Each structure stands twice: as C-alpha cells, then as structure tokens.
Amino acid sequence: MGCCTGRCSLVCLCALQLLSALERQIFDFLGFQWAPILGNFLHIIVVILGLFGTIQYRPRYIMVYTVWTALWVTWNVFIICFYLEVGGLSKDTDLMTFNISVHRSWWREHGPGCVRRVLPPSAHGMMDDYTYVSVTGCVVDFQYLEVIHSAVQILLSLVGFVYACYVISISMEEEDTCRNK
C-alpha cells in the first residue's frame, strides 16, 4: 500500500500539471504566442505519457517525464527571464511569436482591472491596419502574471520530478525483488 501513495500522488500531480498547462495554452493561443504554444503542446504530451506510465507501471515512460521536467523548468526559467528583461532579453521583442507577428501576451491588454482603450490610427497612415491600444489601471502588470504562470509550472515540475524519481525507484526495487525470487 505504501507504494501506491507515491504513484497516486504522481497521478494527481500530473492531473494538476495538465490543467495548468491547458489553462496556459488557452491564453497563449489568445495572444498568438507561438513558442509557448509549441512548448505547452509538447509538455501536455509528455505529461500524458508520464501519467500513462504511472498508471500502467511503465518506469521508462516515467523516466521520459522526469527528463522532460528538467527541460520544462529550464524553459520556464527562460520565460521568467524574458518577461523580467534579465540579461538583455526584452519582453517587447517578437521572440515568443517566432518573429512572424506583432502579437504580445494576451494579459497585456486583458489583465485583471485593465482598462483597454483603442486609439484611432495616426493621420499619416503610418500604422496601416494597426491601431494603438492604451491600457491603464491594471492591478497586476502582464509580465508579472506571466512570471506567476511560469513559477507555478516550475513548482509543479519540481515536485513532479521528485515524485517521479520516487516512483521509478520503487518500480526498480519491485523489479529487482521479482528477479531475485
């Protein structure tokens, strides 16, 4: 019964990671953030693989999940550095959209308490079809919301890493005892 608690905890944690990743995926789609969309998609696939491995007693699948959590933590640390503009990174670049559009984080204009005001294009027509959007009154700036999302992902991944290592070690011990009999 003691072995089940680690597995059950990992299943619950994977479910939380799926919910968190799906929520993040939705808002990244709304903001046309293509790099995070791709990362979230891969994350969802690997978490499902880890969930399957945990339920079906497949330690190799859990190992893939464990390696992915390390990569996922690295990606989320990069996102935190990007939005906090650490090390020469700038949140105003088109890096998250692969330089194919001028879209930014959905939270930039739709954060909690934000009042969005669309201004008409300039008289010179320099802005073509783009209109300037003025955003005021945000309770929390968008970059901090993105940092919070990444911090939650890091926390869930680190706890998932620990539980995955525990479940793998329990699975390996069970295999060793079965081989010795």
Curated annotation (Swiss-Prot):
Record membrane topology: Multi-pass membrane protein
InterPro entries reported in the protein's UniProt record: Na/K-Atpase_Interacting
Tissues expressing the protein: Detected in the brain only and specifically in neurons. Expressed in multiple regions such as cerebral cortex, thalamus, hippocampus, olfactory bulb and brainstem as well as in cerebellum with low expression in granular cell layer.
Keyword Cell membrane: yes
GO CC entries: membrane; plasma membrane
Compartments, record wording: Cell membrane
Domain of life: Eukaryota
Keyword tags: Cell membrane, Membrane, Transmembrane, Transmembrane helix
Chief place of localization: membrane
Membrane spanning stretches: 2-22, 35-55, 62-82, 152-172
A Pfam family assignment: NKAIN
UniProt KW Ribonucleoprotein keyword: no
Family per similarity comment: Belongs to the NKAIN family.
Subunit composition and interactions: Interacts with ATP1B1.
Protein name: Sodium/potassium-transporting ATPase subunit beta-1-interacting protein 3
Source organism: Mus musculus (Mouse)
